[in-house]
């Protein structure tokens, strides 16, 4: 954007993102780099909005794309589906209808460039007949580690070679032994979500996370940990477990009043742990997060990668590794 402005190839910059956190990050980062505001007010170089806000922009707003040379930046573009307006989701339709052929330049970004429903991503190009995504530029984790932008991830899988399942049948009970968590989940009625709520699963994972975080805080005193919980009740259960271990923590969920303020306060504090339900995923920027305990029932590759990304951002010379602790569940292992 800075180069295009300096070369007099654009007049304005518009940014769109899936969440308010990322929008705020766009505004502050672009303002710092360009030396001009991105708040949409008079004198600003542009504006940043959520994808949801696109449908509430009036015709006068979209006329800017015809009257000026505009660079439009899309973050996490995989949220916007479709090449054909009839097969697109609501956000994809707005891009196809309002922006695609009117912007002077577009930059579409994604750390996870695919969709779980297998629909095409808006603005993306695909090979024929294979249907593989064609990227103009790839910057992977290996590149980011080499450039000292990201930490090298260390993933620890917790398993048990003697899982004991006691089944109560009236006055009688039976005990079955399983050689692994995978066998337990595949050959018994126990579900993965039930397992995640068991104290004998929660505590060992938290123990591993706390030990590693305490080790890291000897070098980097404000290093922090993230626990990804399944729901609010689960988050409260995890908070009690952490407090019993003598750890301080915060909970943030989609029901938390002023959730963004809670995240912002945690970002600049020295509190050790934050427990999240659906709030700290893609785009949330808390660089001091360096350890994650994954206790979410969601097992998609998309969600897993997004969560791992929360602990990868490097902030200095000493924080070269990030740690993720989780159960050895077959889908996650793949």
Stretch-by-stretch model annotation:
Residues 3-32, 230-233:
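Conserved Walker A/P-loop ATP-binding site and its immediately adjacent core
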Residues 11-14, 34-47, 239, 243-261:
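Conserved RecA-like helicase motor-core motifs
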Residues 12, 43-46, 68-71, 102-108, ...:
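Loop/turn-to-beta-strand initiation segments
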Residues 19-22, 50-57, 79-82, 229-233, ...:
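Conserved helicase motor
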Residues 30-64:
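Inter-Walker segment of RecA-like/P-loop motor cores
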Residues 63-108, 112-115:
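SF2 helicase catalytic motif II
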Residues 118-222:
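Interdomain helical connector at the RecA1-RecA2 junction of SF1/SF2 helicase-like NTPases
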Residues 248-334:
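Conserved RecA-like P-loop NTPase helicase motor core
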């Amino acid at each position: 954007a800075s180069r295009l402005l300096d070369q007099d190839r654009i007049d304005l910059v518009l940014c769109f993102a899936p969440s308010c956190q990322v929008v705020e990050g766009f505004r502050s980062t672009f303002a710092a780099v360009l030396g001009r505001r991105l708040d949409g007010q008079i004198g600003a170089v542009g504006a940043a909005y959520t994808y949801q806000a696109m449908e509430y922009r009036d015709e006068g707003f979209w006329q800017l794309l015809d009257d000026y040379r505009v660079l439009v930046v899309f973050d996490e573009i995989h949220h916007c589906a479709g090449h054909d307006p009839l097969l697109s989701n609501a956000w994809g339709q707005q891009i196809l209808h309002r922006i695609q052929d009117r912007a002077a330049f577009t930059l579409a970004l994604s750390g996870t460039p695919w969709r779980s429903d297998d629909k095409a991503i808006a603005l993306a190009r695909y090979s024929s007949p294979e249907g593989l995504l064609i990227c103009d530029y790839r910057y992977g984790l290996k590149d980011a580690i080499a450039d000292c932008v990201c930490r090298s991830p260390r993933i620890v899988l917790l398993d048990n070679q003697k899982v004991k399942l006691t089944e109560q049948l009236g006055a009688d009970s039976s005990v079955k032994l399983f050689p692994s968590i995978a066998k337990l989940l595949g050959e018994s009625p126990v579900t993965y979500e039930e397992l995640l709520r068991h104290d004998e699963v929660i505590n060992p994972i938290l123990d591993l996370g706390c030990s590693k975080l305490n080790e890291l805080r000897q070098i980097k005193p404000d290093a922090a940990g993230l626990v990804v919980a399944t729901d609010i009740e689960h988050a409260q259960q995890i908070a009690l477990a952490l407090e019993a271990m003598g750890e301080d923590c915060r909970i943030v969920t989609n029901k938390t009043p002023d959730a963004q303020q809670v995240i912002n306060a945690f970002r600049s504090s020295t509190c050790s742990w934050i427990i999240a339900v659906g709030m700290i995923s893609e785009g949330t920027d808390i660089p001091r997060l360096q350890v994650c305990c994954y206790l979410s029932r969601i097992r998609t590759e998309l969600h897993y990668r997004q969560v791992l990304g929360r602990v990868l951002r490097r902030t200095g010379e000493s924080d070269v590794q990030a740690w993720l602790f989780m159960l050895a569940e077959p889908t996650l292992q793949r």
